[in-house]
Swiss-Prot record:
Source organism: Pyrococcus abyssi (strain GE5 / Orsay)
SUPFAM superfamilies (alphabetical): Glycoside hydrolase/deacetylase
CDD domains for the chain: LamB_YcsF_like (cd10787)
Gene name for this UniProt entry: pxpA
Known catalytic reactions: 5-oxo-L-proline + ATP + 2 H2O = L-glutamate + ADP + phosphate + H(+)
Pfam families according to UniProt: LamB_YcsF (PF03746)
Record carries keyword Hydrolase: yes
Keywords: ATP-binding, Hydrolase, Nucleotide-binding
Name this protein carries in UniProt: 5-oxoprolinase subunit A
Gene3D superfamilies: Glycoside hydrolase/deacetylase
NCBIfam families, alphabetized: PRK05406.1-3, PRK05406.1-5
GO MF term (any one): 5-oxoprolinase (ATP-hydrolyzing) activity
Its job: Catalyzes the cleavage of 5-oxoproline to form L-glutamate coupled to the hydrolysis of ATP to ADP and inorganic phosphate.
EC number: 3.5.2.9
Source taxonomy: Archaea, Methanobacteriati, Methanobacteriota, Thermococci, Thermococcales
Amino acid sequence: MRVDLNSDLGESFGRYKLGLDEEVMRYITSANIACGWHAGDPIVMRRTVKLAKENNVQVGAHPGYPDLMGFGRRYMKLTPEEARNYILYQIGALYAFAKAEGVELQHVKPHGALYNAMVKEEELARAVIEGILDFDKNLILVTLSNSRVAEIAEEMGLKVAHEVFADRAYNPDGTLVPRGKPGAVIEDKEEIAERVISMVKDGGVRAINGEWVELRVDTICVHGDNPKALEITSHIRKILEEEGVKVVPLKDFIG
């Protein structure tokens, strides 16, 4: 049994520091690096790519809405042309730094409100996928487990990694509970570990109302901006390995 462990990193910018990138990077296998629109800047992007390389962590683009003030967590209505080119632009920006450091891009994981909007809006999902395909059809799209987005991507010829969230609560329909609601973000490492093992070994988890949600697991996300990110990530890695689960990058098993 194999699974990837990912985190959203490189989200500092200018004088503002966010996340525990150096510490978390030691325990993950794939890094989703912000591309400068919802967070990140050229200096941070290159440093994060270099840090990933030093830790043998695979690099992926983490594009979002052009919303630095809102950290990409506010919905924006985009035309298909805008969505397609916004994605292409951001992947290209990260690729420049990856190439400079001798690193290949493994995947693309949309950020925040864009990630969630793609689950609800098929036209948006198709436009984002087209933007990825424009750049490189060999990239892997990281998206919500068992979502329509995954189906669309596969129909369009893009490889997919089904993602689950270690530190987020689920609705009965398999979507994430909005961050503003009580219980949406889980911080207890033991509860998180139990949920992760349930997802990986039992193929699902209990939703916030107690209903069972079936989930396919290729990659597990731990948010780097969680105050307990280091503690949680290291504990998840330890528990998975104790349970006989191999923690490896997506490229090793998504073909």
